[in-house]
Regions:
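Nucleotidyltransferase catalytic core that binds NTPs
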Residues: 1-184
Length: 184
């Protein structure tokens, strides 16, 4: 039997405790061997952030240092051109049975992605509820967890305002943000 591998795509700008909680809940409930944290290389759905892919890769490595459930993957960072999940899943397919981990907000928008039918064909999908977006019906597994009201944009806002971010990100992520002078 092939290992079940969770795939969590994110801008990782920065990764936060909500990502960690989702990965831990999914790993336990879905019997995942590991969860790949896949920082988006070149976003296809929004303008690229000021923090380039290598900066966001280092943040993914930092969260993986604090949360052993994660393994940071460079699959999108190293691939030229826009990042599309259908392509990412194709590249990761040899690793095992893939389970794409999504928040309910992302799942609700799945049909707007490039080649959503290929995404569905290349993996199982597991969905966790996000604040403000109830779990939609559909052909997916459910990740039971308390919704965590944290966002990367809130972390960036707090850093810019000089407010604490302790408890919103892991210690290694906070240290990387401070060391690199990010979001100022």
């Amino acid at each position: 039997m092939r290992d079940r591998i969770g795939v969590l795509g994110s801008l990782c700008n920065p990764p936060h405790v909500g990502h960690v909680a989702l990965a831990r809940a999914a790993a336990a409930q879905l019997e995942l061997a590991r969860v790949l944290l896949v920082p988006t290389g070149a976003p296809s759905h929004r303008p690229a952030p000021a923090e380039g892919p290598d900066v966001r890769w280092r943040l993914a490595e930092a969260v993986a240092a604090d949360a052993p459930v994660f393994e940071a993957s460079r699959v999108e960072v190293d691939r030229p051109g826009p990042s599309y999940m259908a392509d990412t899943l194709l590249g990761l397919a040899p690793l095992g049975e893939l389970v794409l981990l999504l928040g309910s907000d992302q799942y609700a928008a799945l049909d707007t992605w490039r080649e959503p039918d290929l995404v569905r064909a290349r993996c199982r999908i597991a969905v966790a509820e996000r604040p403000g977006t109830p779990l939609p019906p559909g052909d997916h597994e459910t990740i039971a967890m308390e919704p965590i009201d944290v966002s990367s944009s809130e972390v960036r806002r707090r850093v810019r305002a000089g407010e604490p971010i302790e408890g919103l990100v892991t210690p290694h992520v906070e240290a990387r943000i401070r060391a690199d002078g990010l979001y100022l």
